[in-house]
């Protein structure tokens, strides 16, 4: 059983048959070895007790009730004086019934069986390692053809006669017909190989280091050839090079994890603990069983039939043996991944059986729903809404959620400040929502980040840290620039909020997970906090400098005509309105706030002389002279005031309040980055 305090991670991979046997086999106090499931039965229909050596056997998986054996005898668990520790009649140990949650069994397969995940899933690991087409391997696994054994050291009858090539489709129909079971088995063990056993032999004969060396040499040779000019040939070479890279990476992974390639072919099939595939009795005496039990029964039935053909019958044609091996392979495929080879297996009500893959994968699978999707303490969930006034690293938490998440911290603060004598008094103050509670909550939240998560968490930016602030309402406020990392929008999306408790978690959240420290995509390095949608429209309206706004465009001529009519009627206004001059941006924004000018009204703003805007060859549109000798050179977007000696006195640029506001925001941001950089250096 996994100790949650000693194990911090879980790795899924291939294991050896010896490891499977060690997990599932146990030795009883009388020296008897149990663990192999040999019968396809579950419960006896009369006694309603598990069948011996069946899928729910108490000898293999442990007692159903703690300390009670199959005979009904009782022993105190953990009492060393009680002897013996198991029932001598039924062989059931007197242990805790929770052992049935983790005690495994195994099925000894009569023939090797290829693990369908490694064969049929793309990319096929077995096909990559053997460097053979997937169709050819499938035909070999499912006994569609055979081949002469390439690893036999002794000269064989077929090799001496030279009658057959590497692959011969007709062997399937010719050879088995002339051999009985015993003769065919001897002939096959020496002369030919078929089924998953052939795959296992080839995988066992592989040298992974030689595969890496040969693949690298071939990759370099293909790279030296260069482009041939033929597009089809170049693509073929490119696909081959990609395949060699995948093959090298796969071989390195096997070496690094100490996994042998032949472990991808099963000789022992693990049987899940009974509590993970239960049979439940419902009202009316009916039984509900996990689909995996029926799939296990199918495997055991076919495996026992094959065992009988190989051991008891001596006159069975070899063709029947090969056919039964194929049925065992298909039964194990259905158990591991139902429907991967075509039509899935269904029950009497035309319902598809749920295999291991269906139980594990997907949103409702074991990992995402049960292990990763469990409800946890110090967490909440609510709809997100836009918070444009928030900083990039802040989020708005509703008061209702915040007081629940930080309740223990608030209680500690109330007791430390002697505002409550005990926990009960502190909780009553929180229920009554006294003003002092919100003050302490503000103090607690200032130094405590929170984690926001939006499912599905597909990459690192799916969970980010924020500094929480209290907001009114019942929705979480989020800065719009962080939405792309979460793949979120404000059309009803929900996000979960978590409170990191330990000091290590808080440090990790502050140093690695804060939103303003994750501005680039971890996948491609491009900026991920970029304005989109509403922000782009707002920037356009802010800097358009157009009285018509965004409602008029070339696709809406009606409004343009109305605007032109309005412009003709108010021609005198446009003709005689004087554009105001401002010495600095503060005066311009102040005039806008006093409603003396509009957001898009053109104006002249004095510019600094050190920031030149003059084009070298640009000529003025108009020149105005004054009586004192100064004159104004008017250009398209700026104006220059010169003295009598043509010295530049002032420079004005033609802009709007919207442009000024955007420029000031950008300037403040640049100055902030500069200060932060200077502090860092």
Curated annotation (Swiss-Prot):
Ligand binding (Mg(2+)): 489, 491, 493
Domain of life: Eukaryota
Any single GO BP term: DNA-templated transcription
Chief site of localization: plastid
Entry note: cofactor: Binds 1 Mg(2+) ion per subunit. Binds 1 Zn(2+) ion per subunit.
A GO MF term: zinc ion binding
Residues annotated as signal peptide: none
Keyword Protease: no
Subunit structure of this chain's protein: In plastids the minimal PEP RNA polymerase catalytic core is composed of four subunits: alpha, beta, beta', and beta''. When a (nuclear-encoded) sigma factor is associated with the core the holoenzyme is formed, which can initiate transcription.
Family, per entry: Belongs to the RNA polymerase beta' chain family. RpoC1 subfamily.
Name the UniProt record assigns to this protein: DNA-directed RNA polymerase subunit beta'
Species assigned in the record: Solanum lycopersicum
Lineage of the organism: Eukaryota, Viridiplantae, Streptophyta, Embryophyta, Tracheophyta
Underlying gene: rpoC1
